[in-house]
Amino acid sequence: MSLENLQLDIKVFGKWDTKVEIRDPSLKKYISLMPVYLPHTGGRHEHRRFGKAKVPIVERLINQIMRPGRNKGKKHLAYNIVKLAFDIIYLKTGQNPIQVLVRAIENSAPREEVTRIMYGGIVYYVAVDVSPQRRIDLALRHIATGAKDASFNNPKPIEEVLAEEIIAAANNDSKSFAIKRKEEIERIALSSR
């Protein structure tokens, strides 16, 4: 059998296809949908500029769930949380969870934010456009933070809360923490133009 005839059908978690549509052209270059069995690159991107753009988007979500706090450094736990959340997303929507995640990132990525500029000891806040890489970082951070905050002191498991957060963000629903944060950031930027 030749290598040309051998087609590998690699799916994330052994279930989900990575052939999804990215509507936002500015984010297309920075959302990596590279098919991998196990989303764990081991930080090989760390020393390259824009290296994290080549890290699979599912692994970047896993890394955000692993942020400081109770789950710091527990990648296997974060892996299982995302895996179960994807199953819940599929059961609730009937769609590919990776497609739902990409739609949630597109909807919850802020386009404009505020930065501080200092002129002669006086601080001015100026609205600036957000780079595509930072837009994805902020969207993933807000999705993970919203899920963690909502699952704290809540009988629902974090997998279910994460699935609800991703679905709400994909539907552009304002009950999602990520959508609320995006609207708040853009409102502050609009007022400081």
Curated annotation (Swiss-Prot):
InterPro entries: Ribosomal_uS7 (IPR000235), Ribosomal_uS7_arc (IPR026018), Ribosomal_uS7_CS (IPR020606), Ribosomal_uS7_dom (IPR023798), Ribosomal_uS7_dom_sf (IPR036823), Ribosomal_uS7_euk/arc (IPR005716). Transmembrane segments: none annotated. Keywords: Ribonucleoprotein, Ribosomal protein, RNA-binding, rRNA-binding. GO terms for molecular function: mRNA binding; rRNA binding; structural constituent of ribosome. Changing G14S: In strain: MT-4. One of its GO terms (cellular component) is cytosolic small ribosomal subunit. One of its GO terms (biological process) is translation. Changing S174P: In strain: MT-4. Gene3D superfamilies: Ribosomal protein S7 domain (1.10.455.10). SUPFAM superfamilies: Ribosomal protein S7. It comes from the Archaea. Pfam families: Ribosomal_S7. Belongs to the universal ribosomal protein uS7 family. HAMAP family: Ribosomal_uS7_A (MF_00480_A). Part of the 30S ribosomal subunit. PANTHER family: RIBOSOMAL PROTEIN S7. One of the primary rRNA binding proteins, it binds directly to 16S rRNA where it nucleates assembly of the head domain of the 30S subunit. Is located at the subunit interface close to the decoding center. This is Small ribosomal subunit protein uS7. It comes from Saccharolobus solfataricus (strain ATCC 35092 / DSM 1617 / JCM 11322 / P2) (Sulfolobus solfataricus). The gene is rps7.
